[in-house]
């Protein structure tokens, strides 16, 4: 597998391509007495390249019969092409060893006998050469005594160029990449889809050859070869693969897992499994093929592979658009393969599945087949058990029910495929799910005939309502029959599959939502679902009532049995699903548009659904969803998408779909209530939607469906409600347990995945919901703008409050229509929420999901009660969750504790007072009405606030409005109109997280919580410190003391400065105060706790208001999670209070999250901090995310800093990176980012980022989406021109079906760091080449104007080289401020972990001052803003390397007070100045850098050069021209290689060349250390990505990886600077020598000169002119760069001035608050 790090190491190097030819002459082999070789083969190999000689006989010798030889009478030549690399300043190529292996070939098997390595670099040269070699090989077998090989090795240089040139890449190396993520069909060229859509597609699918085509489409195919086997083939060789029925079930689980980790590989594996598994279905496939009907769909089962779409040859696909896709999907994929393939399919299904449905299995096949395959496997297995016959039987397209019944196997698999492929389809089915779901069989029947056209539509990404119904129709009748089968299969190892099948069967038999959920579930473990689906299809003939009843009965059984299985299976699957969901998201997106249409039609149909049928479908859905909660979350998106069709499609790529679902679910609930109040039609539609959504979400699956049905039916289906309630109770309890378990996994997955919001099953669903929410937000905002926003905000802001109070009102209304149902719904939702809650800690994306799941969280509370159906169970579940929470996040737990106790108390009271179901339902209803009211009001904040106050959660509600504003401001900037909702949702997620954590973890009693809260609030008011201490104490109780301490320490270190401020804030105004407390307390949960508790207690109004703000801040934090950056934003925010609060709260929240994670890994806290900062910065990247003022500032500050508020700092998590990418590409045509692989394949996303920051570099609107190579080339060339290390080549995106995830992530990490100005700058290298000191980036936040260079330098020196991290001078100035600053810088710097670690490392070497710089280096640019980099010499003296100073004083690097230029610019400026000085003969040493003189010190030139010529403190600037050269390293870059302090003196006497050599040596040592660690990290990271085993560890490694990459790039930049120095120095030296000689010549009289002398003089003059021109060119470049840098400085100064004023206002306000 190609090494990302090796590519990074090649940046800036030279490459030479050689052709080596080995000519074998003789092989001598001596063996033991008991053995002699048969045939010998000489293999020349490296990695995955093998060049073998022909097999030759071994002839024993006459003298020694055991010593034989192989002699080539005619020399045999083998040739290889090798690319060798070298540093530009070194002639020797880097080592590259190829191995000669002697192998014995016997009976077709080969055994290695001996090997020897040959370093080709030793035989490479510019001149062709032949070298005779006699190599002595090392025996690798006990049978070999001695081996020698004689050959001639010749090497010829083919071409030379830069290591990053396209033609220098090794194709073999490229192709050795193993894609580690599943691709979304949406992201692939549409030509594939068109092929699949072709009328003959179904037939083609039937043909075996097409599988090859698919394979060509996807490199992964090779891995999936077995899976690709046609159905017949699969049947033929079932033994070779896993057993059809049992294996499939077991297989799917692993595939899912693999899928999560590396979508493609697992998919491939699954495919292999599929073939064997398919054997059972194969018989039916033949029928299917002959019949060409839905039943035929099963035939494709053998060929579930995407590549093997041909397998899907199941003509059955043609039978109906829906069925066909399913068929190809189902039959082709075995259970196992479907699991993995599903993931792929999920991603790709959206586009390809839809398009290829009818005949698309070639493309869709891969993804669909995977998803469908698993299901189909399950279905097939079941079919084999009993429904097989029906599956085999052909069904009429017209009677989809009969089709489903007769060919349920085929169709159910088909449906599953569709489900996986199309969340929209799932939605349709869900609507239709009950079969009576309102899409009557008639609609389906009608659709069935139309299936082919529909499939075509699907291909286009549009799904007709009819289509959905046809898919949905299949399985109503046989659930009972097949339940037995399913159960039987489960023991066979299909437990997972069973759970999934359960969900799927309900999905098929029930409604689109169910199927959607089941589809997702199916992707995780669709086998069972498929099985069930078949049975339900089989009974499709039965009356709806019968079917409904049977479905309920069977499902309840399944739910009971499966629910138990599912919890674990789902959990395991969840992780797997985590990966699948990404794909599903895309699918969902594509299918969403279709689903929207389908949903609309389905909504009508659903309205028409019979109560019983609805009930049945709902109960089925509920059970299925309960089992599949993790997976179900995704289907939820489908229904949601109904409303926002456009959004669904647009946001399909992202997790927006999920958001929409959540939003829709909430909206539906709200609307349902509102409709109940005011709009019956809307209520029905939304009820249906929520029905689908909830069902899919698995939150209130049965209850929601029921209530939805009731709503659709005019709230007139109490019967169904009752039934649903019962079924729900059964499934819900088990499901809850499952969910409780799942949350952990989800949390880990989400956290690890980060970008992998999708990876978390339920959380994933939630992330999708979040995405949908955004989409829906737009759609829904249009219809219910206020409602959604307010509601979401309410949910997000005051989840606890809303949970406690709103749930009642919500439930009350719902109770009328869906009393029993809602209870169940809430329970399910609660489960999902639990997962979600766990997830939010982990990933911003998850947080979004949580936000979307805020409603779910509320439901969770109700659910806690309702699921408490056995109250004990619910409480236990809560306790478990609480434990998990506490483990995952101490801080969060504490925070949650306070509200939780309240919530618990409320919930318990409600539960105890009323039947759990009723109470919960009432709560939910109450919530809904309240939310609705708020949303309808538009400003609903007052209402919410009032209600919240009533419930003691007023504060939270109040906060909600604030949050809305803030969120809308922040997110509005970032994501546009969608952002507010997203933020709200994020907030919701965050609050939810905290609340749920509180509920589960603390399980504190309301009284205790209130007391704690009151104490906390009082403490905060009393004293910031006291408050902080108390908060910490509170946190400690909530969390283990060590953890709390660790959190505190980490955050304290990171946020110490801010914490001081925050303390004041906390003490002063609780809004800011609590924020600060949260933020700084390491969010010791107490602050958050206070926040929540404050809201709960309602505390005094002031605290309440503060609480809301706090909450808002916390929410904002949650929103951006990333908002960690909001610290900077705080500074940048126009409204200092809110913004600062937000900023602090965000940091606090991050701390909490970090703490949560920290329980698992204390590092997590730091990570959270980094993530926060990063996310914040990322969000900031949206540009002015903060209030308008801040928005203005940000643009001013730096175009490259989208979120310049709090400079993004370095990327800390894959999720934050993914979100940043989504944010900056938002609104670009054809760009839909859902992952780090296929979303980037066509190059449009890269081009969009380039265009976003550098519109002049590329004409985005002229790009052709189908011209993959050219698009990528333009983007890569553009970034390379800007200085971004080129890790990717167009070939990477073209040759690999799924681009390498790690390479793409690494490249994007570099792009983000560059575009946001957060690149690390090398500040100083330790003499021994030990750890170097780095600083975050461009110093974009340059020194505030208020800090003049002199003042700053002086202060830094005084404080041990402390550098003000932020413009907050007051804090920095504080005596204790320095350490705080350093730690805070570290926090800001993006990788809190990294920063802290670095600080720790360098603190010692650099001394306290070093600590400051260290922090600075790792800190956000805020500190760098000063632009001064203080290097601390061994002496410990502080040197402000940064501003060197006057142009004359070459020694000091150009002052970059504003740090706007990158360190590279500094170097350039230095060189330029030096050049000028030299030109002017001004080599005089300008020591000018007395430490104090820094401010004015540098000579006039210094002042001129930089606004703040912070001359490096005198330690640095030893006079002497030499110093000029050392300064060559721009201050930001690195100071002299040796410790600047001590060596400064030496440097003045050193020659520039000596200085450069010493620095280069130190750089090499530093690089060696980084390279060693990077190799380990990459190896571990790839292993974890492929296995998906430990998401938490993966995320930790990703953060470390990003840090290493940033350090490596800093070293590369510094090396480039040194190279320029060397060139300039060389020019100077030559100029000096030429000038001296020329002067000597000119001293001779003209008449005395000989002809030779005259000629020599002419040559000297020409050379001199040439040198001058070259130097001028260098100077021109430097001038250009410097001018740009100065312009940036001016712009930054204005922004910093505003920020400074803001900060001062904030500080004064905090002081007042503290006093008060």
UniProtKB/Swiss-Prot annotation:
It holds the Pfam family bMERB_dom. PROSITE patterns: BMERB, C2_NT, CH. Its main location: other. The keyword Hydrolase does not apply. SUPFAM superfamilies: Calponin-homology domain, CH-domain. GO terms for cellular component: recycling endosome. Interacts with RAB8A, RAB8B, RAB10, RAB13 and RAB15 (in their GTP-bound forms); at least in case of RAB8A can bind 2 molecules of RAB8A simultaneously. Interacts with BIN1 and AMPH. Interacts with DNM1. This is EH domain-binding protein 1-like protein 1. It comes from Mus musculus (Mouse).
